[in-house]
Design a protein with these regions (language model features):
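Amphipathic alpha-helical interface segments within eukaryotic helical scaffold
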Residues: 1-9, 13, 344-348, 362-391
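Alpha-helical repeat/alpha-solenoid scaffolds of the HEAT/ARM/MIF4G superfamily
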Residues: 2-88, 195-361
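Structural signature of alpha-solenoid helical repeat scaffolds
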Residues: 31, 89, 93, 148, ...
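Residue-level detector of extended alpha-helical repeat arrays and alpha-solenoid scaffolds
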Residues: 36, 94, 98, 153, ...
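Extended alpha-helical solenoid scaffold regions that build the rod-like backbones
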Residues: 113-116, 125, 133-143, 182, ...
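Non-catalytic protein-protein interaction scaffold segments in large eukaryotic complex-forming proteins
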Residues: 116-117, 126-202, 213
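Short, compositionally biased segments
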Residues: 163, 295, 411-428
Length: 428
């Protein structure tokens, strides 16, 4: 019914059906939980539909609607959020309504405000989202500790990151005052002990993608031409980025990504065993938007490209420490080794002058391809992938015949599932 009402509203609201939105708002703020929930659901679909209209007159009408809708919906969201925190036993209904209210506010703030931070209500929403998200994470942990379902709390927490990401993408210059709190919030929860017990995969992906979006935002890059005009917001955004990504935070983030996120998990190994071809192809396309491993890899590459001078020594030190340890078929050591090799492969173009790949290949990598222990398959696969990454960067022609023989031997001498995975990983 809510979707049907929204489809009618697309053509009739607000001109032919002016009472629709005021009626929904009044029911939303009422005392009947079920009626309030249904009104919020309908309002969400109506706002979502109206926000998708692109004609100038429709955009103007939606901006006017946003100015009238933001205050009551914001007040309802704040009330429902507080109710969910104060009554955890009854949090399910409160959380569902708070989530619907926040989804509506997300559309209003992103698509209904020309500059969100110039609207007092939109500014309140965005600045409050950091603390509200932290509270949602705490509520999720409390629900899990009590043995209760926490799926709604997870969706609610993730929605806060989507609000920030959409605002950054649609209004990058208006987002400048939020860059610092966004980076601090994401880094503290993902890369420090404060996030222990609070994180889950979708939220972690949302935080990492926010950091990457700030790094890669075109509007936050100063012009290369010294004579080009410089927007004050652009220069301020660049200053905030450079101040935040100092040497110590960068080193901490780099090490954490490689040691905590890059190693394969038990689930990864199970997926590999179940369907090798599917496993090596699942990280393609835009998997970084939703999956943790490709998300962390994309962030690592973005960090390395922008801060190569600071991060190259860190990664080289990790590589030296890894190579100082003899190859071991013990699974945990093999996984740690594979993670470092993965990082070196992703940074191949940035490490051209730093790594003697020919020497490394002859003194270690080719010998590692000959290790047949089942646990060492993760390193063998990564070595083949690593050679594929470096072959177009820095590999002597005289070594290629030996490389071909070693790779062929590594692929053909193992079981069918592992062999197909090794064969496919050359294109990963």
């Amino acid at each position: 019914m809510a979707v049907l009402v929204a489809r009618v509203a697309r053509f009739d609201c607000p001109r032919e059906w002016p009472e629709l939105v005021p009626t929904l708002v009044s029911v939303t703020c009422g005392e009947q939980p079920l009626a309030s929930h249904r009104a919020l659901l309908t309002l969400h679909h109506v706002v979502k539909t109206l926000a998708s209209k692109r004609l100038t007159a429709d955009r103007r009408a939606f901006h006017e609607l946003t100015a009238a809708l933001l205050p009551p919906v914001l007040a309802a969201w704040q009330q429902l959020h507080a109710a969910a925190l104060t009554a955890p036993a009854d949090s399910r209904l409160h959380l569902e309504r708070a989530r619907l209210a926040l989804k509506t506010l997300r559309r209003l703030a992103v698509h209904g405000c020309r500059r969100p931070l110039e609207s007092a209500d939109a500014q309140t929403l965005l600045t409050a989202s950091f603390e509200r998200c932290r509270q949602a994470l705490e509520l999720r942990r409390a629900l899990l500790d009590a043995g209760q379902p926490a799926a709604l709390a997870e969706k609610y927490a993730v929605l806060h990151t989507k609000l920030l990401a959409d605002t950054l993408e649609t209004h990058p210059l208006s987002f400048v005052p939020l860059i610092q709190p966004t980076l601090e919030f994401c880094a503290v929860h993902v890369f420090t002990e404060r996030g222990a017990g609070l994180l889950f995969e979708k939220f972690t992906v949302g935080c990492l993608n926010l950091i990457k979006a700030v790094l890669l935002c075109h509007e936050y890059r100063p012009p290369r031409d010294d004579g080009a005009p410089r927007e004050p917001e652009t220069m301020e955004a660049h200053r905030i980025k450079m101040a935040f990504f100092g040497s110590q935070p960068l080193e901490q983030m780099c090490r954490h990504l490689v040691t905590e996120f890059f190693p394969l998990t038990a689930a990864d190994l199970a997926a590999w065993d179940a369907d090798p071809e599917e496993y090596v192809s699942e990280d393609s396309g835009e998997a970084w938007r939703f999956s943790l491993r490709p998300c962390t890899q994309c962030l690592f590459v973005a960090l390395f490209r922008q801060f190569q001078a600071q991060l190259a020594p860190v990664l080289l030190e990790m590589l030296r420490q890894t190579l100082a340890t003899p190859p071991s078929p013990e699974l945990s050591q093999a996984l740690a080794r594979e993670a470092v090799y993965s990082a070196v492969g992703m940074a191949a173009f940035d490490l051209y002058d730093e790594v003697d790949f020919d020497g490394w290949l002859q003194s270690g990598l080719l010998q590692e391809l000959a290790i047949r222990d089942p646990n060492y398959r993760v390193v063998r696969r990564r070595v083949i992938w690593l050679i594929g990454r470096w072959v177009g960067v820095k590999l002597s022609a005289r070594l290629r015949p030996e490389v071909y023989r070693s790779v062929t031997g590594a692929v053909t001498g193992v079981g069918p599932m592992v062999g197909s995975c090794l064969d496919a990983c050359g294109g990963q």
